[in-house]
From Swiss-Prot:
Reaction equation(s) it catalyzes: (S)-2,3,4,5-tetrahydrodipicolinate + NAD(+) + H2O = (2S,4S)-4-hydroxy-2,3,4,5-tetrahydrodipicolinate + NADH + H(+); (S)-2,3,4,5-tetrahydrodipicolinate + NADP(+) + H2O = (2S,4S)-4-hydroxy-2,3,4,5-tetrahydrodipicolinate + NADPH + H(+)
Key words, A-Z: Amino-acid biosynthesis, Cytoplasm, Diaminopimelate biosynthesis, Lysine biosynthesis, NAD, NADP, Oxidoreductase
A UniProt-annotated Pfam family: DapB_C
Enzyme class: oxidoreductase
Protein name per Swiss-Prot or TrEMBL: 4-hydroxy-tetrahydrodipicolinate reductase
Amino acid sequence: MKILLIGYGAMNQRVARLAEEKGHEIVGVIENTPKATTPYQQYQHIADVKDADVAIDFSNPNLLFPLLDEAFHLPLVVATTGEKEKLLNKLDELSKNMPVFFSANMSYGVHALTKILAAAVPLLDDFDIELTEAHHNKKVDAPSGTLEKLYDVIVSLKENVTPVYDRHELNEKRQPQDIGIHSIRGGTIVGEHEVLFAGTDETIQITHRAQSKDIFANGAIQAAERLVNKPNGFYTFDNL
């Protein structure tokens, strides 16, 4: 499989290493600013890469969105987070002409977490719910795309939900419909996501901890391996 990388930060550098270990080939890289240290052919436009089988994106909205407005037809794996609604609308439009896969978190364990959460929410309907995510001190967006995904699962199963991002400004007791959303940034934390169900005299915590960023890179590669054989359409872990 011949792979075009969109972005060449820490994540796509891991994708390159792991993909080559699996026998795949990196045929090019698209970056905001070309760098002499990048060990692959650099391009400005997706359509310029004639021999790619798939593109894997671990970048940012500033790089990705202009590329999505260009004319190209290439299976696309997208892991960029930020400006989610705009991104999903654009990917849905593109999926009419090419297979597109999107996940805010490329870990299959996180996908499993969403399924566990979907089963737990109806069972614990009268429990308060708090969501917490923790990442390294260089992560820019908050809350993480994964935490937003967990929140979306809850919203799909509960009515009149209210996200609460900054409780100290409210100066009032917690309301039953509140969903607390908390972000922690520090050190080299790879990624942690926790759902707390707090009831009367008991709590339940569901946690996913990433031990290495390789799980995200491998998840993207595995998605690409499946996507190249799919018809046009929008794919997630649910239907890939």
